[in-house]
A protein has these predicted regions:
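Charged, compositionally biased N-terminal leader segments and the immediate start
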Residues: 1-8
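Cofactor-binding active-site loop characterized by glycine-rich and histidine/acidic residues
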Residues: 21-24, 29-160
Length: 160
């Protein structure tokens, strides 16, 4: 990791927190065209994991994906445009806050449905393994996801 890691982490944490606080401020205006689920208080998980990943590594996330999207290098302007339902949004304004994606940054997507990105991540990781690529796939999910059948099925598949 780079020199001054603590300063880099702090700046990333601060930036993400400020963005989400601004979303909180703007949301009641009804200009944001999608429901939002914040990751305030959870920023450090995304920042820490993404700091250990390379630009070629990929992540999958949950509906609380703002921190992950930004920590992995997703474009802030594209993210905000997505929240506003604009064409220059990360998913052309069609997906909203809970379905952020930035393929160029390695942010493969988030989903509003609990645990659904887990099998996608496992399948992507298997493809990487079969192609003998030196890349990492990380998937983020909440504790509720571990109660879903797809979580257990994915863990069994990942063990192959």
């Amino acid at each position: 990791m780079a020199e001054h890691t603590d300063e880099i982490f702090y700046r990333s944490l601060y930036r993400i927190r400020r963005v989400e606080e601004e979303i909180v401020r703007l949301y009641p205006s009804d200009r944001i065209k999608s429901p939002v689920h914040l990751s305030i208080g959870q920023e450090s998980v995304s920042v820490g994991v993404c700091a250990a990943l390379s630009a070629n590594d990929i992540v999958f996330g949950t509906y609380r994906g703002h921190a992950l999207y930004l920590a992995k290098g997703g474009d802030l302007n594209s993210m905000m445009a997505e929240l506003y339902g604009k064409r220059d949004g990360s998913a052309r304004g069609k997906a909203g806050s809970m379905h952020l994606i930035d393929l160029g940054a390695g942010m493969m997507g988030t989903s509003a449905i609990v645990a659904t990105t887990i099998p996608h991540a496992v399948g992507y990781a298997l493809a990487i393994k079969m192609r003998r690529e030196n890349r990492i796939v990380a998937v983020f999910f909440g504790d509720g996801a571990s109660d879903e059948g797809v979580y257990h099925e994915s863990m069994n598949f990942a063990a192959l």
